[in-house]
């Protein structure tokens, strides 16, 4: 099991056990930042840790906060087993 899988597993477990989704999101973002810093450090060994942190924070600040999505409509169809459903996208 590699490190990123372990971190993702820990983040998911903390999200399930924690009461706040924002808290879990902050943990995942922090872990992602740390992973980016380590990867960037391995690629750019001549940079200092402070420069790496500033670059990563600038990259994160430039990203949009919301995900843009097109409106879609779906129809749910139950299959023979009550545990399975099929989503059919309606073309409009």
UniProtKB/Swiss-Prot annotation:
It is found in: Secreted; Host nucleus; Host cytoplasm. Keywords: Host cytoplasm, Host nucleus, Secreted, Signal, Virulence. The keyword Signal applies. Transmembrane segments: none annotated. GO terms for cellular component: extracellular region; host cell cytoplasm; host cell nucleus. Residues 1-21 form the signal peptide. Its main location: secreted. Disulfide bonds: none annotated. The keyword Signal applies. A motif (RxLR) lies at residues 30-33. Has the canonical translocation RxLR motif, but lacks the canonical EER motif, which characterizes most oomycete effectors identified so far. Secreted effector that completely suppresses the host cell death induced by cell death-inducing proteins. Belongs to the RxLR effector family. This is Secreted RxLR effector protein 21. It comes from Plasmopara viticola (Downy mildew of grapevine). The lineage of its organism: Eukaryota, Sar, Stramenopiles, Oomycota, Peronosporales. The gene is RXLR21.
């Amino acid at each position: 099991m590699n490190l990123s899988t372990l971190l993702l597993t820990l983040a998911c477990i903390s999200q399930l056990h924690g009461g706040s989704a924002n808290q879990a999101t902050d943990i995942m973002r922090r872990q992602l930042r740390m992973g980016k810093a380590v990867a960037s450090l391995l690629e750019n060994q001549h940079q200092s840790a402070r420069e790496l942190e500033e670059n990563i924070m600038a990259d994160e600040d430039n990203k949009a906060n919301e995900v843009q999505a097109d409106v879609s409509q779906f129809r749910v169809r139950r299959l023979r087993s009550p545990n399975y459903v099929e989503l059919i996208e309606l073309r409009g």
